[in-house]
C-alpha cells in the first residue's frame, strides 16, 4: 500500500498528479458490480418487455459512454485515450438480478481503474433507472476493482 495520497499536495490541497515523465505501457482494469431485483423484474428485463425498451443494451451503451467521460465526472482524473471498453451484463437467478463487469484498456501513463469503475457504476444506474417503475426495492452493490494490469505497480487481482 502507498504511504500517502497522491492527489493531495504537501499543504493538503487537491492536486492533479503529473504523469508526464511516466513511460507509456499497456494498462487494463476490470471492475464489477450488481443490481439485485425481484425475480419478476429480472424476467421482464430478460424477456425484453420493460416499458423503456432494451434494458441490457441501453445499460451496456451507457456504461461504455460513461467510461469515456470519466475525466469529466471525477475531479483530478486524467482524460485518457481508451483503446477498449467492454461491458458484460449477466443474469444471476440466485442474486437475483444482473451482474455487471467492465474492462477498460489503453496504452498510456496512468491506470484505468476509474474508467472501469465508472462504466460499472453507470451501467448499474441505467439498469436501475429503466426498471424502477416496476421494482422500487432494487439494490446496487458490490462495485469494486477486481483486477488491474500494467504500469509501474504491476498486475493485481482481488
UniProtKB/Swiss-Prot annotation:
InterPro entries: MoaC, MoaC_bact/euk, MoaC_sf, MoCo_biosynth_MoaA/MoaC, Mopterin_CF_biosynth-C_dom. It holds the Pfam family MoaC. It catalyses: (8S)-3',8-cyclo-7,8-dihydroguanosine 5'-triphosphate = cyclic pyranopterin phosphate + diphosphate. The keyword Lyase applies. GO terms for biological process: Mo-molybdopterin cofactor biosynthetic process. Substrate binds at residues 76-78, 114-115. Pathway: Cofactor biosynthesis; molybdopterin biosynthesis. The active site is at 129. Keywords: Lyase, Molybdenum cofactor biosynthesis. Its EC number is 4.6.1.17. Belongs to the MoaC family. This is Cyclic pyranopterin monophosphate synthase.
